[in-house]
UniProtKB/Swiss-Prot annotation:
Belongs to the thaumatin family. It comes from the Eukaryota. InterPro entries: Osmotin/thaumatin-like_sf (IPR037176), Thaumatin (IPR001938), Thaumatin_CS (IPR017949). Induction: Induced by ethylene (ethephon), salt stress and salicylic acid (SA). Strongly induced by arachidonic acid. Disulfide bonds join C34-C227, C75-C85, C90-C96, C141-C216, C146-C199, C154-C164, C168-C177, C178-C186. This is Pathogenesis-related thaumatin-like protein 3.4. Glycans are attached at N235. The lineage of its organism: Eukaryota, Viridiplantae, Streptophyta, Embryophyta, Tracheophyta.
Amino acid sequence: MARAILWVLLTVMAVSLLLHAGVEGVNFDIENQCPYTVWAAGTPFGGGIELKRGQSWRVNVPGGARGRFWGRTGCSFDGNGRGRCNTGDCGGLLNCQGSGGVPSTLLEYALNQYQNLDFYDISLVDGFNLRMTVVLSNTNCKRIACNSDINSKCPGELKVVDGCRSACAAFNTPAYCCTGSFLDNCPPTGYSQFFKRECPLAYSYAKDDPTSTFTCPGGSDYKIIFCGNGDSQSNSTSTSSGSLYAVE
């Protein structure tokens, strides 16, 4: 929870500067290949939108920004965009304004950082709800994915409707959340090792940086695929321009 709050504070403080900095932005194309509707979300850029199977959504994000994208499931909203979701809920709003509720599979990004590099990762620190693949238009940059059906394998004590909570979200103890006396020395637990086995390229818990954070020269566009198989070019219905991406 503390990690999510810190992330929100950092991104909110940066937004007002970035919007007027004149830095060229990059595109994030979010595509739903799931056999059901997903309500995509992005903060502090994007907000939220309903994506039926095969639909996609383009969000332009300014250079230098930090943020996250994720998918929500089991949602119901009224005409004013108010309601709730089983996973990834944003305080009952279609147009997200906060970090989103647990559990949710996250794509986290920080653009044009040290030596003009982008930093990006798939995070399961808040748990898992959807399979996710991330492909960059710069083909020299690593495609990352979490394509295991974790929900079907989730330990009973972590299982919720449509998702699998992290141990931190489920138990909220220092050992699982890497807080208090575990802030500087927080080894993996049996639960985080479960997530790591299922998705080796994703953050399995808060201190999983060495094997889970990836870099790419700034300026690359991103494609986020919900429920993609990760091994073929996808087809989607979208009003945006042609694909720049090839999934290896």
